[in-house]
A protein has these predicted regions:
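Internal gly/pro-rich beta-alpha loop/helix module
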Residues: 127-260
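Cysteine-nucleophile active-site neighborhood
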Residues: 294, 319-396
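C-terminal and late-domain segments of enzyme folds
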Residues: 110, 219, 263-264, 276-289, ...
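Beta-strand->loop->alpha-helix junctions that form or flank phosphate-binding loops
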Residues: 39, 174-182, 293-301
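Phosphate-binding active sites in nucleotide-utilizing proteins
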Residues: 252-253, 258, 264-330, 334-341
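ATP-dependent carboxylate-amine ligase catalytic core
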Residues: 2-19, 25-113, 121-148, 156-160
Length: 475
């Protein structure tokens, strides 16, 4: 069977994509189908839901972060181990950079990977208007990628009423509906959805949703459409088999760089708990590809960093929700501060950057002492401070080898000491600001970097960890 993929997209955010994606993944898993998941765009939280449902990593695919060749490489990685790929879109189907560009949109990703699109339409409070709405969306679909629609938040009876109208007037298959499920509600907070570990009984809720989707949607028809697309496009290209995008052992791709056997594999201690949990899977894989050995630790629960650590990676998350616990873990704060002051290389992004400050206010406005590496404090501004994609360049070259790295920001907190080592520039409007504290061994700031957009960042960080390892062993 040919590998089949799809992009599950919607006209706008809040249409129920994540709920239906999770229900679909669970239903496919219940059918014993080998399925994997991706998220279009830079979001961290949706892939966490995918992982909870299917038990394998879900990765981001983003046409701003990566060029077409790299996108195909990332999608091709491990593809032969799975029969299906489900990519959850971001925002509206055609919404890219700045809301006005194609680049970065779910549709652009579908074009890049030559995949079909299944729409999720929030049909609440609509009748024939949904035909007009779908007609407009189809008019923009010049590649004819949209192969079907699922009517969300509507009854089975009304779906049966509207199906012949939509199919006869638009020629668009209606793949069923998904009625409102009071038992399944993915709650949100200021950074988006609440994290899956915060939701009691998530697996049971998603399995119930999967059972309902099997009842109210025609998944057999959807899978047949995906297989037909894969066959048609394989034969169109003169092939009866999808091409291998990577040759094992010969690959020069960004995630498959061979480790130099003669060099040490430095240990990179990665913060991972309720406070620090935002990591791009491909960032972690690239650190390993360049020779780093990743070990996990919890700034919330453990007393100190791992003894074998040669470098620290403090990712994003929700440290403001755990400010008291982080502050009261004095031994960990001291351990991190002493390690960095003694020369251990470190990267801290967004939430990790906040943790390195002298203090941080929690959501109630109470101020808590933090690690004390960066002079200043972080406070909730009550509104989005910076949001969207940026290109980050250094004022003086340390980590980036003279090239930009692509990144994303989304935060309501701000620092009174954001740093001035780099300049961040928004790709459409050209708005810019200074950011980042860095030297040859440390990089601290709000932007969430996508490392494969500039692998020199990882190469420099791992080499700094390797140098620290040698220095420590020489003492």
């Amino acid at each position: 069977m040919l590998h089949s993929g799809m992009v599950l997209a919607a006209p706008q955010s809040g249409s129920g994509k994540t709920t239906i994606t999770c229900a679909l993944l669970a239903a496919m898993k219940n059918r014993k189908l080998a399925v994997r998941a991706f998220k279009s765009g830079p979001d961290y939280i949706d892939p966490m839901f995918h992982r909870q449902v299917i038990g394998v990593p879900s990765r981001n695919l983003d046409t701003f972060f990566s060029g077409a060749d790299q996108i195909r490489e990332l999608y091709g990685y491990d593809r032969e181990s799975f029969s299906y790929s489900v990519i959850e879109g971001a925002m509206g189907l055609y919404d890219g950079l700045g809301g006005t560009q194609k680049e970065g949109s779910a549709y652009h990703l579908a074009q890049t990977l030559d995949l079909p699109v299944v729409l999720v339409l929030d049909a609440r409070g609509m009748g024939r208007t949904m035909v007009a709405l779908l007609a407009g969306i189809l008019q923009y679909d010049r590649d004819h990628r949209i192969i079907g629609v699922i009517l969300n938040r509507t009854s089975e009876g009304f779906c049966r009423t509207m199906t012949p109208v939509i199919e006869e007037e638009l020629g668009l298959p209606v793949l069923g509906c998904f009625p409102v499920q009071k038992s399944l509600h993915l709650e949100s907070r200021h950074l988006g959805l609440k994290m899956p570990q915060e939701m009691e009984g998530l697996r049971q809720q998603v399995n119930q949703a999967a059972e309902k989707l099997e009842e109210t949607a025609d998944l057999d028809r959807m899978l047949q459409l995906l297989q037909s697309w894969a066959l048609l496009h394989a034969f169109r290209d003169g092939k009866t088999k999808l091409p291998k995008l990577q040759e094992p052992g010969k690959d020069k791709g960004v995630l498959q760089k061979k480790k130099k056997q003669q060099e040490e594999c430095p240990v990179i201690a990665v913060a991972k708990d309720e406070a620090f949990c935002f990591y791009y899977e491909d960032n972690l894989r690239l650190l390993e590809a360049y020779g780093g050995k990743l070990v996990w630790f919890s700034p919330l629960a453990q007393e100190k960093i791992p003894e074998e650590a040669d470098a620290l990676l403090l990712g994003g998350g929700y440290p403001e929700l755990c400010a008291r616990q982080l502050s009261e873990n004095v031994s960990m704060r001291n351990s991190i501060r002493e390690a960095i002051e003694n020369g251990m290389p470190s990267v801290a992004e967004c939430g990790g950057f906040m943790y390195l400050h002298e203090s941080m206010t929690d959501e109630e406005g109470e101020n808590w002492p933090m690690a004390g590496i960066i002079t200043g404090s972080c406070h909730n501004r009550g509104k989005l401070v910076r949001f969207g994609y940026v290109n980050v360049t250094e004022q003086t070259s340390h980590f980036l080898a003279g090239k930009p790295v692509r990144a994303h920001e989304f935060h309501y907190y701000d620092s009174d000491n954001n740093g001035e080592s780099c300049v961040a520039v928004k790709p459409v409007r050209g708005t810019s600001w200074t950011c980042i504290h860095e030297d040859d061994r440390n990089w601290w700031g709000y932007p969430h970097l996508y490392y494969p957009s500039n692998p020199a960042f990882v190469e420099h960080f791992v080499q700094a960890a390797r140098l620290y390892h040698r220095e420590r062993n020489a003492k």
